[in-house]
Amino acid sequence: LNAARYIELLREALKALRSGPAKTAASWLAELPVQGRDAAWAVREHVIAAEAALYRYDATRRKPEKPDGLTELAIATHDETSVQSGRAIAHGIRRTRELGNLPPNICTPIHLADVARQMAREFGNVEVDVLDRAQMQDLGMNALLGVARGSTNPPQLIVLRYRGSRPAPAC
């Protein structure tokens, strides 16, 4: 079983669970050996795939979509570190999908800049700089400014810097 086939297997299993009658399920798929990958990778990918399968967009819907089928999945593992890592990655993917699914009259450059600033406040190891039209002109970003002329919204260039985690103290 190679990595691509494992991910495809996860997606197909989760798709079947989501469209079926079960509300909760347990999975041992993370225990399958995957060529060239360790068990931590399998657990992490399983968590990411499960979160993707459970995703429902309803940010701008009057009535949130009623969950159909699967709403909770237990993954058989003792590797809590890989589960947490998968959840963190899945959270980032979900946040990105939410932004991508928002209509353009809501998800404007200013809205994206506000989200970036919120991320910088939320995570101490993320820094943000937002350049406005004047700053972009000073830097000679004429191609970007040319594209922005087609919009009624003012351009914003967002620079997010991830500064990594702090090293663990040496004992």
Predicted regions and their residues:
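Short amphipathic alpha-helical segment within the helicase RecA-like ATPase core
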Residues: 1-171
